[in-house]
């Protein structure tokens, strides 16, 4: 008996391992795996269905077909275990060994492994320092290669043609060896002395000067180093023994009708064996060379096809013209082993069905059809039936269940009680796509879903299906309940706002009951409490919308100690709102609900409830809100009819005015006063303005109605028009949609994004005519096509993001860094789009924050997690910028620390150790991807047709403050800006910044620093269509190189009669004017050159082409006067890439087409001699050294001679390249740039994503550094290495007093970064599997299984969340004290108990 137990344990034993290493297999190793040589191409005997001896399915090699039974049937049963049958050679054992036992084929001639030959860069080629073309000529028998030159003048590795070879043989007899085919390559590789080759290369690197040679040498050195370190031998890249896959992994299945279905691999193996046997026979017969060569080449080709079909030449096809699936195809791609079987498995105990709405469910429940539940929980039901004695055996229990006896249902009820199930809706774009619920048994066949979780699942009830999964083990049930229960996921992990928010009908009901209307029955009554209101309402004494006074009892909960104090007050409210106050939880102030309940306000209400009262109360409250909303939506009876679409009376008049304007422009165009482009733009402008006017008139018509109030006066009030109610409450529809129903449809876009200038004047109520209908379908069709493409693109972006960030996990509490990002409010066009409080909420402060102007007592100390209370404090103290910790500057060696990450957005307290923040970040950015647009906006599209801004009008009252503004005082008393980066802020009474504006060069500023301004006051203005050149000194103008008709053209304005000069384009000037450069110089009365104040540069201004000078030679100019102006037309026609493509471009760190050119250093600008198509820009820095930049003539240079620029400032207009920002400004500005640009795209679509998610991805893009000076390290110059490796190596060198390596950060796009990860398993399962595995095998890479993906692939718990403790325990047990594991085991890495999750309002340290 003991033996038997041992036997079972033996079978269950798995290898325990800590890492996986991949390397080249030596012939001896392959033979050691093998259980015998496959000699025949036969598979099975088609009459007996038994495998042929020595064939591809041979039982003697691979093991028996039936458990414990040899092939001929001599030995059967367990007692003969381990016996080898002398008749048929089969070992008596389990049949499943056919899945693991390998065979081998001894190749009659060596064969080069195609991966190491053809996968670029060719490893064999690098090793031999030969080109791929040459090696292929040798391999495929087109040329000889010299393997051993002996004393002859021939070179080793020299190629010889047939004739050259014969000549050489005659000349030198047998003094040299040359051969062709894989033998030759094998011989060359075998004879390489790696060590001496290495020394030779290092010497060569030291002496070489050429860049390209250096690159090639570094590559070779790296390869040879890899071979030396990994213990691989170069000749193993050429195979002499071929391993054969176990037969059960390439099955052969008999179909009915005597045919067989077989894996393609069998065909490929058969081909190899046939050719190999034929070659062997030919060699024994000493066949002619040419025949043998041909056979060898065919063998090479068949092995190539087996390993990677189609990599070289045409793919070998089967009977049906379809390429055969080779070993490489088995593992790569979406259907390959990695993505199909290892990362995505099908699971047992699951089912799927259509979903319907369950409005009576509680938030933590879902309705599960009885039939499904019975099937899913079968084993549990069986067990319980047995335990109760209702069935004696499992079989009997099965019968009971099949008959569906009455007691079965009772037991099912018990089994299901408090056993959560997981519901999942595909596509699962973020973690809220799978949530746990407690099942409630229902009749019918559809799953019932709680309406409030629909937003998270993105589900609707038009036929969506959902899958149900049953967590079986106790641990799984615990995790489902504590972490995945729908009640624990009230906040969205993307932005920390509630995601359990009522929508549609519920909003409509709540909005309806909370509206206030004039002069309704019972207005002005006073009630003692809410129950009195309810009685009055039920008895129809008051109407729902009547304005009344009610005495309301409020409970105030202290956020610190939770003390409750109650007080009463009489409140002006309405009957509906008083009824609503009954469902408010204790401690939520009534004024939050005493307003119109639009969707925004409801969201705010739920948010406040969560922050003030915690999880439990909020969940109950959300459910009550839903029930109430549904009830009153039913009572409201809101529905829309065609008469609700009121068309404004003014529409006709507005249209007539617009048509007259368009006609006028048409006439101007015909008389040549405006160009075609201007006409188009102006017409489009007129129509978009008209559209807005009609929309406004329509909203006034629909949104207001005239009523009599209680005093009998007629007043306006918000109307109860059904259409308006729906849009205003946020239940359904928007102003833009109503405008199409009742205003005018307006301008339509063509499929390329440009705008059709004839608008659609009708609306849907009036109906469209044929032309209008056609115009509107034209652009709409593109929209539908886009939607389909968008989903795929968005999914691919998410996949890349998850892959790059999958191993970012919180591994420690604090890494101790003092670095961070400085946060300021985000301002766009003067408006604060994101105030400071929103940006720093949930972040940890990196250094103490003081009151502005007071450095004694910090308001917030370092390492404080800023929650709502702290943020309010900062705002009261009117702090303008805060340095916060960020994952970008986190110094944890693996993963990131909790302090640098800050608050867990979905829970509202500091993030736990083990949280997989990388994946959460990827999901938060990828999930809204489908909402982004796909199109590229062309300027001239309505989307971007904002009228040009030409002044700054402040919106708030306060005082003016200038930031880094350089200005000169004009004679008129105003200031003129002469810097580009100047900004003007308006501060309120507390010194808080309320608005901020950019001041363009040449702006006239009418306010001074510190002036008081009133709201609506204009403080600066400029000409938006011209870029001025402003004089910084007073004097007289002198023209230089102004040659009429050559460099300038005189023009006289027809209307004003004034003369002006326009500078011509240098391309059109002809040869004699090549050296001429038109300059305006300013001189004093005596004609001496003046200099720019505080510099020794002459006051002169180089005039770019197309600039216009209105002054005459010798005219007097004052300080701040405009000398010349450049029309701003051409530089503005850049297309704006928007939406998803823009986000992808930023994450892939692609260089823009015409990137902005940034100043390489700080200094003074001057212009040197131009070359043919380029201008020469020189920056002279403080120590006098100069830096030159050649800039194409067509680019817009936005700096002037003599201007001071700082390093990294834009000197040529364009889109900055992220690589430049990193190189010139560093990591923090790059992070700020990426965050800002990506947020801009999402903000345009109204999607909120927290900055920290983008920062996590940016951190991963900056993982690698480039070595600039190797010092005494093991790295090479120019090598890209993981940052952490360099830091560790440098720390090691410093302790030994050796020179550390110097490095620069490198920015990689997310695809590159994923492929460059340290784990080859993770990279191979992402993209370019062949390349990754080839590279890894050559280096003998070891994968330490640290990321999430690798652990999923090898079938372990992931090292995140609850799995972190398991991994820490494993490492401890195996005696591996990894540095990061010490930090982990020191701190408890367990999931918080449920209790703390529930009351996690406080900041837990």
UniProtKB/Swiss-Prot annotation:
Co-factor binding comment: Binds 1 Mg(2+) ion per subunit. Binds 2 Zn(2+) ions per subunit.
Binding positions (Zn(2+) 1): 70, 72, 85, 88
Domain of life assignment: Bacteria
EC numbers, comma separated: 2.7.7.6
Gene Ontology CC: DNA-directed RNA polymerase complex
GO molecular-function term, one example from the UniProt record: magnesium ion binding
SMART domains named among the record's database cross-references: RPOLA_N
Catalytically driven reaction(s): RNA(n) + a ribonucleoside 5'-triphosphate = RNA(n+1) + diphosphate
Assigned keywords, A-Z: DNA-directed RNA polymerase, Magnesium, Metal-binding, Nucleotidyltransferase, Transcription, Transferase, Zinc
TM stretches of this protein: none
GO biological process: DNA-templated transcription
Pfam families for the chain: RNA_pol_Rpb1_1, RNA_pol_Rpb1_2, RNA_pol_Rpb1_3, RNA_pol_Rpb1_4, RNA_pol_Rpb1_5
Cofactor requirements of the protein: Mg(2+); Zn(2+)
Protein family (similarity comment): Belongs to the RNA polymerase beta' chain family.
Function, as annotated: DNA-dependent RNA polymerase catalyzes the transcription of DNA into RNA using the four ribonucleoside triphosphates as substrates.
Protein known as: DNA-directed RNA polymerase subunit beta'
Lineage of source species: Bacteria, Pseudomonadati, Pseudomonadota, Gammaproteobacteria, Lysobacterales
